[in-house]
Amino acid sequence: SNGNITTLPVSGTSVLTCKSGKAVLSCKLTVVSPDNIITNMSTLPTSSNQDRFTVTVNSYPNVRHYTVYRQSASINASSFKNYMPYHGCAACAAATVLTGFGKNITPKRVTDKNGLEYKAFGKKIWKKNYKKELKDQMPVSLYGINKILNNNGIQTEYVRRFSDAEACQQIISHLKTGNPVVIEAKKGKWANSYHTMVLLGLTDTGKAIIADSANRTGFGSKQRVKYESVSNLIKHMFACSVSGAKSANCYFGSSSGGGYILVNPNL
């Protein structure tokens, strides 16, 4: 009736049966390695053409529930007219990460007055961006997202300069801990210019689970959640320039907007 259960350091499932007299208790146990966490494709959405919905991804010691947003949806709009459809990918990405850590955050709460940007950057920096005309406003930079996450109690490691091989290995290893990675894509398959997305985890088929706030008909029916190998994603990412690697710009600039953020790293 008293004692400890010891498991081997490997993943898998087993059945534990306990008997006491005529009573029998049978439990199915799942052993999870905290450095090899994956999510079965069968549990992930096959259709994600919604304005706002939740994706559940395995983590350690529990699962994480992420809310994924469509940046062009009126339900997710900012107080700044048309900002979210044009520039809202970063705000959506920040909100998605925060929801996975138990915080009830929407993109609007990221951008609006007295919101997360305002509190993390200060009134002067926030106002300078949003008083501009729409075409001159900028999305939050990865540096800015990093600052928002830290300001809300989430540890991060912002990697600004990288080689493709090193980044691929580091991102895969990090995703296997059950924690997300925020990335910036350049113009091409994933973006019309620059675009911020969140890698939520890895599937049992080895693909990254991607939360993408933008509509992409090339992926079929404008899905919010997409799946791609990390090695292919790396081809569309970019590092900060040497001069931009020390930038403290909270809003996007192409020289300082690159890299990726490891969220909740094992520091």
Regions found by a protein language model. Name each.
Residues 1-36:
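Extracytoplasmic soluble-region selector
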Residues 14, 87, 195-197:
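Residue-level detector of short, conserved catalytic/binding motifs and their immediate flanks
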Residues 23-27, 154, 195-197:
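Short beta-strand segments
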Residues 32-137, 187, 222-228, 235:
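Active-site-adjacent structural segments surrounding the nucleophilic cysteine of cysteine proteases
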Residues 82-91, 135-142, 164, 168, ...:
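Solvent-exposed, acidic/flexible segments
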Residues 129-158:
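Mid-length scaffold segments of soluble, non-membrane domains
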Residues 160-219:
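Active-site-adjacent substructure of cysteine-protease-like catalytic cores
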Residues 202-267:
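Noncatalytic regulatory segments and standalone regulatory/sensor domains
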